[in-house]
Design a protein with these regions (language model features):
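Mobile genetic element proteins and their domesticated derivatives, centered on retroelements
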Residues: 32, 39, 58, 81, ...
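C-terminal anion-handling pockets and recognition modules
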Residues: 117-167
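Acidic/histidine-rich, metal-coordinating catalytic segments
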Residues: 58, 72-87, 110, 115
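RNase H-like polynucleotidyl transferase catalytic core
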Residues: 15-22, 96-119, 133
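Extended, low-complexity cationic-aromatic segments
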Residues: 1-60, 165
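Distinct, well-ordered alpha-helical segments
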Residues: 89-93
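Structured catalytic cores of enzymes that bind and process phosphorylated ligands/cofactors
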Residues: 60-71, 145
Length: 167
C-alpha cells in the first residue's frame, strides 16, 4: 500500500494507528515463491490479484525452473494455499499444463502458519517496507523489488547450516 505499514507501533488501547499520508491508499499485489534450495525469493507484482496474475507468476517459474529442450529437468514441488486465485478453473488448467515437471502440494484451508512464505512476507513488510510512504503504486512496486533483492542478498550471505524440511 502507498500508506505506511506500521510495524511494532505503540498506541493506547482503542486508538487508531494511522499515519496521515497524502493521496489515496493504493495497493500492489505480491505473488511469490521461495526456492528452499538456494533460499531465493521470486516475486511477481501486479495492481490486481487475479488468476491471470497467478498464471503470470507461473510463467515466471517456467522461465526459471521449467524444462528446457534437450536438457534433463528437475521436478519442482510448489506448495500452495487454497486461495481463490490458486483454485480457479483458469489456474488449475495452468497447473495441469505443467504437471510433467511441477507438482502441487495443497495446504489445508485457513492454515497460514504452515506456509513458509508467510514468514517471508512478514519479514519483508516489517523490516524492509515498514514506516514508509510512497508517492504512487509504481514507487511502491520499485521499493518491493529493491527490498526483495536486499532480502535475497541477505539470505544468500547467511546460508542455513542445513535445509529446513517441511513435513
Amino acid at each position: 500500500m502507498t500508506h505506511p505499514y506500521l510495524a511494532r507501533a505503540w498506541a493506547k488501547t482503542g486508538a487508531d494507528l494511522r499515519v496521515p499520508a497524502p493521496g489515496q491508499a493504493k495497493k500492489v499485489a505480491l505473488l511469490g515463491s521461495l526456492d528452499h534450495a538456494i533460499r531465493e525469493l521470486v516475486v511477481h507484482t501486479s495492481p490486481t490479484k487475479r488468476s491471470s496474475d497467478f498464471i503470470a507468476h507461473l510463467e515466471q517459474l517456467d522461465r526459471l525452473y521449467g524444462p528446457r529442450p534437450g536438457q534433463p529437468f528437475t521436478p519442482v514441488v510448489l506448495v500452495e494455499d487454497n486461495g481463490p486465485i490458486h483454485t480457479s478453473k483458469l489456474a488449475l488448467a495452468a497447473l495441469a499444463a505443467r504437471a510433467h515437471w511441477l507438482t502441487v502440494e495443497w495446504l489445508p484451508k485457513y492454515a497460514p502458519e504452515l506456509n513458509d512464505i508467510e514468514l517471508v512476507w512478514r519479514d519483508l513488510k516489517a523490516h524492509h517496507l515498514a514506516h514508509q510512504t510512497f508517492a504512487d503504486p509504481d514507487a511502491l512496486d520499485q521499493a518491493i523489488h529493491q527490498a526483495v533483492g536486499a532480502l535475497n542478498d541477505e539470505r544468500m550471505a547467511y546460508p542455513l547450516a542445513k535445509l529446513r524440511i517441511s513435513a
